[in-house]
Structures are given as C-alpha cells and as structure tokens.
Amino acid sequence: MSRDPILSLPWPDARPLPDTFFDRDALLVARELLGKVIRHRQGNLWLAARIIETEAYYLEEKGSHASLGYTEKRKALFLDGGHIYMYYARGGDSLNFSAGGPGNAVLIKSGHPWLDRISDHAALERMQNLNPDSQGRPREIGRLCAGQTLLCKAMGLKVPEWDAQRFDPQRLFVDDVGERPSQVIQAARLGIPKGRDEHLPYRFVDAAFAAFCTRNPLRRGQVAGRDYHLLGHQDPHLQ
C-alpha cells in the first residue's frame, strides 16, 4: 500500500493518527487518545467506537505485561510506538497500542459507539449483533463497549488477526474526529493485584462518559482528591 497520505486514506477527510502520535510517553498517549475513534472495517461497514477510557503501562512498573520480560507473544510491546498488542483477558480479546520506549503501552479499556456518515446505524447494528447480551438480545448502546473485552467483541477485533500488526487505514486505524474531552478523570488502574503498583494513577476517563466505562470512577462513595482527580483540557497529568 502506498505511504502517500492522500492515496492511503479510506475517504478524503479521514485523519488516521500517525505513528508519531503513539511514539511518545504512555501517559500522554493514554490521555490524548480520549475522544479519538477506533474504526474497523468489516465488509462494506466501518464499525466505530469513541475511546472513553484508557490505562497507561510502563516496562519498569510491576503492573505491566512487559515487566514480566520479553517473549515472542509480547514482542509488540517492545516495538516502536503504534504497534498493536492484543491478548486474552477473562476469555476475551483486549486491545493495546505500543507507546514510546520499549515495553510501554496503552490499554484501550472502554469505548462508546460512534455514529457519523461513515459509521452509520447499519454499522451499529453489526456491532450489536457481534456483542449481544446474555439473553442473545441487542446490548444497550451505552454498555456495548463498556469494558476491554466487550469493546473488542463489538468491534470484531481478534488476537490472531491483529496482534503485533500495524494500523492499516483501509482496515483498522484510530481516527482524529476533532473531539476533545472538556474534563478528564485520572485514577488508579483497575484489576491490578496488590503489591504490583496498583496505586499508580495511570487510568484516564472522559468525564462525560464516566457512566459508560468499565467502572464509574464517580460512583457513590468515591471522593475527589482521594480516589480520583479531575483534570481540565490543559491540566498536566499527575505523576
């Protein structure tokens, strides 16, 4: 496929994120991915989900896969920023993107179905067919991508097809549609075992979509400044 930016676009105003976007600090990438849209082509349909929740991971901290060492399965984590790293979690597929520096990456934790002239209601219907509820019925739109494995299931993303691959603007890419969260929630990551840097505030949530992420950081009992921090559009992330 040609590397010419015009010839490689799936439609004229598509804005695929370049590798340079990903080849930066994982915390920065994780935060700036909020509002971007994952697009995956299935036949003549472009399935799409807005990224609403991410988690950053680093080689040197104990919560990351990379901290366990290099293996052939984990090789995408050690490649340049912009490689796709997929693995199985709780019986489902999970989507990650490598970031700047060997072993650093961002996990796409949750999304929300995105509708526009490219990804229309037919695409949404396909996503609901791919990820029905436990009774086989169409899953509620707000819960369709509310978790890392639910997201991949609804988007039709599979480990064997995409692990260690690069983005392909004709098949799978992250689109900059011009959306920016007005407020971002920063909190500790989910599901990290005790003693493996579970306290690190490397999780980012688009505050407007907090109710649709894996676990609502604004739920009853959570206290600002203790359990999470609210960041404005220009505020620096916490270290």
Swiss-Prot record:
<keyword id="KW-0378">Hydrolase</keyword>
<protein>
    <recommendedName>
        <fullName>Putative 3-methyladenine DNA glycosylase</fullName>
        <ecNumber>3.2.2.-</ecNumber>
    </recommendedName>
</protein>
<keyword id="KW-0227">DNA damage</keyword>
<dbReference type="GO" id="GO:0003677">
    <property type="term" value="F:DNA binding"/>
</dbReference>
<dbReference type="GO" id="GO:0006284">
    <property type="term" value="P:base-excision repair"/>
</dbReference>
<dbReference type="Pfam" id="PF02245">
    <property type="entry name" value="Pur_DNA_glyco"/>
</dbReference>
<comment type="similarity">
    <text>Belongs to the DNA glycosylase MPG family.</text>
</comment>
<keyword id="KW-0234">DNA repair</keyword>
<dbReference type="GO" id="GO:0003905">
    <property type="term" value="F:alkylbase DNA N-glycosylase activity"/>
</dbReference>
<dbReference type="InterPro" id="IPR011034">
    <property type="entry name" value="Formyl_transferase-like_C_sf"/>
</dbReference>
<dbReference type="InterPro" id="IPR036995">
    <property type="entry name" value="MPG_sf"/>
</dbReference>
<dbReference type="InterPro" id="IPR003180">
    <property type="entry name" value="MPG"/>
</dbReference>
